From Swiss-Prot:
GO terms of molecular function: ATP binding; ATP hydrolysis activity; RNA binding; RNA helicase activity
Gene coding for it: MSS116
Motif (DEAD box): 230-233
GO biological process: mRNA processing; regulation of translation; RNA splicing
Family in the record: Belongs to the DEAD box helicase family. DDX18/HAS1 subfamily.
Motif, Q motif: chain positions: 71-99
Enzyme type, top EC level: hydrolase
Protein name: ATP-dependent RNA helicase MSS116, mitochondrial
Chief site of localization: mitochondrion
Annotated Helicase ATP-binding domain residues: 103-285
Listed PROSITE patterns: HELICASE_ATP_BIND_1 (PS51192), HELICASE_CTER (PS51194), Q_MOTIF (PS51195)
Length: 550
C-alpha cells in the first residue's frame, strides 16, 4: 500500500529544545486569581482556552493585506496612551475584527454582537472600546469594577489579562486587571481582589458565580460600565448557561446603562437568549466569519486505523507517530488526545521512554493549575513536540502550527471528535487527523458516515509487532500506581459505552485486563470494593478487589 501523500507545510521558524526539554516563557501573571472554582459540568474540565495565534506577528505584518489599516489612523478615536501601548506591544495594523469594531460601531459604547473566531484578535477588539470609554471620563472610584469580561476557561482568562496589561501599560494612571478562576487559594486571592483596585475583572463563570454570592463582592460592581461575554458559544456549549444567567442577575441590571458586548463564532439560540439579557434592542451585529467557508473538520484530511485488541493500541500509536514523522520530519508538532485524564498521564509517562527522540508534554485536569499554565505556554512556543492531552484542550484552544491530531480510543461523541480535529489546520495552515481504535471501537467511523474519515493508507497494524518490545521496555519505567489509575479510568470510561461497544460487563473486564497486561501488569491492578460498586461492576469476575493504600 502506498504511503500517505507528503504534506506541504508552511515555512516556520526553526527552534530549540531537545527531547523532553522545556521551553522558556510563561504567561504574565495577573494581579489576583480569585480561587478555587466550584464543580463544573462534566466535560473533563470543560473547555476552550487561550488564543494561541502569534497576535504580535499578525498585527505587525498585516500590511500585506491591502485592506488592513494601521492603529495610528484611530488617533482621533483612541487615547494616545492606548496607541502607545499597542505600539509598545508591536501591534501596528488592525486585524479584521478589530477594524470592524473600532470603525463600524455607532459609538465605542454601543452594544454589539460580534462573530469572530478564536485567534483573530478579539481580545484587543473588546478591550480598546471598553477602556477608551473609561478614559473619556467614566473612571470608577477606587476598588470598583468597571469592565467585566466573562470567558469559558482559566487559560483564556490569563491570556486576556496578559493582553490587557500590555494595552494599558502606557496609561498615565495604573489600571489593574484582575482574574477570577479556580486553581489557587480562595481566601488569599479574594483578599487581594478586595484590597486591590480591580478596574478590570476577567473571570470564568463558575468562580465568578461563586464569589458574587458574597454581598461585599457584589458591592464592587456598582460602577459597572462594560460587560463582555467572550467565546459565548463555547461557554454555553460547555454547560455554563445557568451560571452566566445567575451572574447577570447578581450584577447591576442592564437598565443601569452598562455596555454589553457578546463575542461568538456562531450564534445558536442559546447565545441569542443570553444576548437579550446583555444587549439593548437595536444592538449592532458585526461579523468576520465567512458563511461560505468550509468548516475545519470538513477540510482536514481524516483517517482511522484499528487493531485487533486494546493492548496493541500502544504499539500502534508508536508506529503511527513514527510513520507521520517520517512523512514530515521538519518541525513535527502533534496533539494526542486520550479518553481520560489518568489515561493521558499514562501515555505521557510511557512515550517519554518509548519515543525519546521526541519532546513530549502532558496537559490534563489532574495537573495543578500552575503546571497546566506552564505546559500551555511551553507547547505554544515549541516548534516541535507531542502534547498528550485530555479535553481540557479539546474545545477552542489554539496551539500554533499543530500539523497532526491523533485521537486514541473512542471519542465520547461526534461533537467531541469534531472539536479535537479542529485543533489542527488553524489560521490557514495544513493539518491532518488520525483516529486510533481497537476492534470493538471501530464502529465509530461507520456510524459517522457524514464525516470524511478514510482508512489510514499505511498498514500500521502490520508494524505493531516490531514496536511491542520497545513498548514493553518503556512500561518497565512507568510507576505501577500510574498504571493502576489508568486501568481504573479505562473501566469507568468504557462502562458508559457498553451498548455501543457491544460488550457485557464481563467482557469489559476481560478487555480492561488485556489493557493492563499490555502495561506489563502481572495481574489486574487492585480496585477498592466501594469503587467497583460505584462503577456498577459488583460481582463481575476478573476484577482484583483490594486496597492500593500502603
Amino acid at each position: 500500500m502506498p504511503p500517505p501523500p507528503k504534506r506541504k507545510w508552511p515555512n516556520r521558524p526553526r527552534g530549540g529544545g531537545g527531547a523532553n526539554g522545556s521551553a522558556s516563557g510563561t504567561p504574565t501573571t495577573p494581579r489576583s486569581t480569585v480561587a478555587q472554582q466550584p464543580k463544573r459540568p462534566k466535560v473533563e474540565d470543560a473547555a476552550p482556552a487561550a488564543e494561541g495565534v502569534d497576535v504580535k506577528q499578525m498585527y505587525s505584518t498585516s500590511a500585506g493585506n491591502a485592506s488592513a489599516k494601521p492603529f495610528s489612523e484611530l488617533s482621533s478615536v483612541l487615547d494616545k496612551s492606548l496607541l502607545d501601548g499597542l505600539d509598545k506591544m508591536g501591534f501596528e495594523f488592525m486585524s479584521p475584527v478589530q477594524q470592524k469594531v473600532l470603525t463600524e460601531l455607532p459609538s465605542l459604547s454601543s452594544d454589539c454582537v460580534v462573530q469572530a473566531k478564536t485567534g483573530t484578535g478579539k481580545t484587543v477588539a473588546f478591550l480598546l472600546p471598553a477602556i477608551q470609554n473609561l478614559l473619556a471620563g467614566n473612571m470608577p472610584p477606587r476598588g470598583k469594577v468597571a469592565i467585566l469580561v466573562v470567558c469559558p476557561t482559566r487559560e483564556l482568562a490569563l491570556q486576556i489579562a496578559k493582553e490587557c496589561n500590555g494595552v494599558t501599560a502606557c496609561l498615565p494612571r495604573k489600571m489593574e486587571c484582575h482574574t477570577a478562576f479556580g486553581g489557587t487559594s480562595r481566601a488569599s486571592n479574594l483578599k487581594a481582589f478586595l484590597n486591590g483596585n480591580p478596574t478590570i475583572l476577567v473571570a470564568t463563570p463558575g468562580r465568578l458565580d461563586d464569589i458574587l454570592g458574597e454581598e461585599h463582592v457584589r458591592e464592587r460592581f456598582t460602577h459597572l460600565k462594560t460587560v463582555v461575554l467572550d467565546e459565548a458559544d463555547q461557554m454555553l456549549d460547555a454547560g455554563f448557561a445557568p451560571a452566566v444567567k445567575k451572574i447577570l442577575r447578581r450584577i447591576p441590571p442592564k437598565s443601569d446603562g452598562w455596555q454589553g458586548m457578546c463575542f461568538s463564532a456562531t450564534l445558536p439560540k442559546e447565545v441569542l437568549d443570553i444576548a437579550k439579557i446583555v444587549l439593548f434592542p437595536g444592538f449592532t451585529h458585526l461579523t468576520t466569519v465567512d458563511p461560505n467557508e468550509v468548516p475545519t473538520h470538513e477540510r482536514v484530511p481524516q483517517y482511522f486505523l484499528s487493531v485487533p485488541n486494546v493492548g496493541q493500541t500502544f504499539a500502534a500509536l508508536s508506529a503511527l507517530i513514527q510513520e507521520e514523522h517520517k512523512q514530515d520530519p521538519t518541525d513535527f508538532k502533534a496533539i494526542v488526545f486520550g479518553t481520560t485524564a489518568n489515561g493521558v498521564g499514562l501515555l505521557y509517562d510511557l512515550y517519554k521512554h518509548a519515543l525519546p527522540q521526541f519532546r513530549v508534554f502532558e496537559l490534563h485536569s489532574r495537573m495543578s493549575q500552575p503546571m497546566r499554565t506552564r505546559t500551555t505556554a511551553q507547547f505554544k512556543e515549541a516548534t516541535s513536540g507531542i502534547l498528550f492531552a485530555s479535553d481540557v484542550v479539546g474545545r477552542g484552544m489554539d496551539f500554533p502550527n499543530v500539523g497532526l491530531v491523533v485521537q486514541l480510543g473512542l471519542p465520547s461523541s461526534t461533537e467531541q471528535y469534531v472539536h479535537r480535529v479542529g485543533r489542527t489546520a488553524r489560521a490557514g495552515k495544513d493539518g491532518r487527523a488520525v483516529l486510533v481504535l481497537f476492534e470493538k471501537e471501530a464502529f465509530f467511523p461507520r456510524i459517522n458516515r457524514t464525516l470524511p474519515i478514510k482508512p489510514y493508507p499505511v498498514d500500521i497494524a502490520a508494524k505493531v509487532p516490531e514496536q511491542e518490545a520497545a513498548i514493553t521496555r518503556a512500561f518497565a519505567n512507568v510507576e505501577e500506581e500510574a498504571k493502576a489509575k489508568a486501568y481504573q479510568a479505562f473501566l469507568g470510561y468504557n462502562k458508559t459505552f457498553l451498548k455501543k461497544l457491544q460488550l457485557s460487563t464481563t467482557e469489559l473486564v476481560r478487555v480492561a485486563n488485556e489493557y493492563s497486561r499490555a502495561m506489563g501488569c502481572p495481574e489486574p491492578p487492585l480496585i477498592e470494593k466501594s469503587t467497583i460498586g460505584k462503577m456498577g461492576l459488583k460481582g463481575v469476575p476478573g476484577l482484583n478487589i483490594g486496597s492500593r493504600r500502603h
